């Protein structure tokens, strides 16, 4: 079929005799997955904005641990598989697989995360058959390497959901991070202002008006949840 022919073509022009650049090889590898992988939606937001809780609610299952220590200290893919599983990609390219029950304990070990590039959580969730998610540590991480990794991953995403605490929405502290969102992703990006139950209806309307003005060049729509 077409996908098979495409993969054979990619394999051919990736051969050393064609002197392909690493950037080209990475792009070809990404394109070759498009026939198999569901589209990737990025979940982005500042620390403790409720990204993991939002994803759990969306998926109807507590797949991601929540609490003080964020699982998204590293980029975390959430993908479909028949069984729960955790894959750890180390900086040296080595894959390590663990039982999903070990996830919380693993992310509590900050020293262990230093050698990790990203995590993938596999789950037998029907939504994940159609959409994969990437829960990111944000674009203002203390680690330049983590920020770079997030930016590279965003290039693979087809849509983006920004999660912001409603009482902290559209403040200057967010704008530098928002400016790092790729321009071609902004038309498929939305902002969700989390924990609207903290505010009165009048305050929600005021915040939404301010956010729509501030976010106008970054998101196609803004909503309070």
Question: Which sequence ranges carry the predicted segments?
Answer:
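Charged, amphipathic alpha-helical linker segments immediately N-terminal to NTP-binding catalytic cores
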Residues: 1-19
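Generic structural signal of hydrophobic/aromatic residues within well-ordered alpha-helices
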Residues: 6-9, 24-28, 103, 107, ...
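Residue-level recognition of alpha-helical structural elements
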Residues: 17-24, 146
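Pre-Walker A adenine-sensing motif
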Residues: 22-34, 38-39
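Globular "head" domains of long coiled-coil molecular machines
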Residues: 35-225
């Amino acid at each position: 079929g077409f996908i098979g022919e495409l993969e054979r073509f990619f394999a051919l022009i990736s051969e050393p005799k064609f002197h392909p650049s690493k950037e080209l090889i990475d792009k070809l590898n990404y394109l070759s997955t498009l026939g198999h992988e569901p589209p990737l939606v990025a979940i982005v937001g500042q620390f403790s904005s409720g990204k993991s809780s939002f994803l759990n609610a969306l998926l109807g299952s507590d797949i991601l641990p929540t609490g003080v220590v964020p699982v998204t200290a590293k980029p975390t893919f959430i993908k479909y598989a028949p069984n729960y599983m955790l894959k750890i990609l180390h900086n040296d390219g080595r894959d390590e697989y663990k039982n999903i029950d070990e996830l919380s304990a693993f992310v509590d070990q900050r020293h262990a995360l230093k050698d990790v590039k990203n995590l993938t959580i596999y789950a037998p969730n029907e939504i994940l058959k159609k959409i994969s998610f990437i829960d990111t540590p944000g674009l203002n991480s203390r680690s330049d390497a983590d920020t770079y990794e997030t930016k590279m991953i965003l290039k693979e995403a087809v849509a983006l959901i920004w999660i912001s605490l409603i009482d902290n929405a559209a403040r200057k502290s967010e704008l530098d991070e928002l400016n790092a969102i790729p321009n071609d992703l902004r038309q498929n990006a939305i902002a969700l202002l989390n924990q609207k139950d903290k505010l009165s209806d009048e305050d929600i309307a005021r915040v939404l008006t301010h956010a729509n003005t501030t976010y106008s060049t970054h998101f196609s729509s803004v909503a309070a949840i």
